[in-house]
Amino acid sequence: MYKRQLLLGTAVGTLFTGANFTVDRLNLANGAGSGSATVISQWTTPWHGLEALGDMRNVALGLAVMFLAGMLACQYFMNNIADETLFARARRRMLTLAAPFLVFFLTFFVWLLFSDGLAVDAAGRISAEPYKYLHNMLEMPYVAAALLIGVVSVLWSIYSGWRGKRNAVWFGGAGTVLTVLALLLCAGWNNTAYYPSLAEMQSSLTIYNSSSSEFTLKVMSVVSLMIPFVAAYIWYAWRAMNRKPITREEIRGNDHMY
């Protein structure tokens, strides 16, 4: 049921643990006149990245994401289903999922703080740096603050759910967004290689060596101006769906209530 969340979390873990690939940008020049597609990156193992499943650090994050997804789903049911029996079941299930989520997330996070990372200097040279992600948190206090607020918010949602509060999902959802954002910023900001290469260190991806052309970035900047409109539509759609609590009769029926 949660296979996708497990694989997604495992894949995100490789932003910190790395993958076996190489990047050769000279292929852009060598293949310019060939008329065929130019490949500048390739896997160095026949597993094509699936070896990430063999790294328990990646799997720990994958399991954390899997249990978190289930926990948030239960909190959503608690907030939107007007049935005391289903509410009680969702509450019990949420508490069951919260315990392994905390174990696996803390396992990954403690490892992250004490692990080495790859730093990039002004010349673009990539080198290993002990405790890189811990340094990132200390040198970017706003990211650390976002992470702290996010984690506390998720913990509060668990406590609220345990107390039987229906609004636990709002704390859980907001805390999840802040926590994920902080981890992604920690992976790529502060001169950090956000996708380390285990095969060749200098092939690791950074914001500097993997950015698109100036034209593409300008187009993306213009497109990003539509984000507020997309966010407004999402808010409207969710408000329409959640305007009235879901009842047992609605679950059994085929009609839409929005």
Predicted regions located by residue number:
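Hydrophobic membrane-spanning alpha-helices of multi-pass integral membrane proteins
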Residues: 96-107, 143-154, 172-186
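Conserved small/polar residues in nucleotide/adenosyl-binding loops
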Residues: 1-5
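Long hydrophobic alpha-helical segments that form multi-pass transmembrane helix bundles
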Residues: 10-87
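Hydrophobic alpha-helical transmembrane segments
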Residues: 40-68, 134-151, 210-230
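Short, membrane-exposed interhelical loops at transmembrane-helix boundaries
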Residues: 127-130, 196-216
